[in-house]
Amino acid sequence: MIEKRLGPQGMAKRWKSGSEPPVGHTLRGSDLGTGLARLAVVTSHIAAPDIDADRARLLEIVKDRAIVHGKVTLSSGKEADYYVELRRITLDGEAAPLVGRVMRELTDDLEFDAVGGLTLGADPVATAMLHAAAAAGERLDVFVVRKAGKAHGLQQRIEGPSIRGRRVLIVEDTSTTGASPLEAATAAQEAGATVVAVATIADRATGAGEKFAEAGLAYRHVFSLIDLGLA
């Protein structure tokens, strides 16, 4: 078999037609420019997450799976005709990534590098945000605030990377009285952190927002009772 050898023009023509550059071919500036242009075209077709679609789908899932109708007693002691069980959402394989991305977008204007809250409601929310940040090529640490300090080991109340001297976000799935996020915020401040805000997935409109304001904490939420069809 006789192999036909190509000159520089032939090699360039074959490469530009879509094949790999020939072995031994020295890349010129124009070649590099062509390669970068192709890379830009390819990456432009990699769709970024559509936050509006994420939010809409998350709302759909919350309405379908998390709202329980019937008489229930809330943590405040008051009775309600419904209950929003968001752990069915934050621990769900489809919904959790949506929670992470939507909560990140909700707090995108805030400066913080760690997120956490009082166990248990805050834990999956914070972890979802950690994974959403990692998927975006960013780092976000998570911390867990125990309901009481350990009586053994290091006897620490906050688990995870140190938050001393750091700006942190307190999260919760939902809050009725605001007690859990406030307790977590106090623990974080005692550990040397600066709390930038409190953020939840759903606001029940039962006074938590007012409690946060009294404590000097900014507060934001993804969904209101109107969004959930409960008001």
Positions of predicted regions on the chain:
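Short hydrophobic transmembrane-like helices used for membrane targeting/insertion
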Residues: 1-2, 11, 23, 41-42, ...
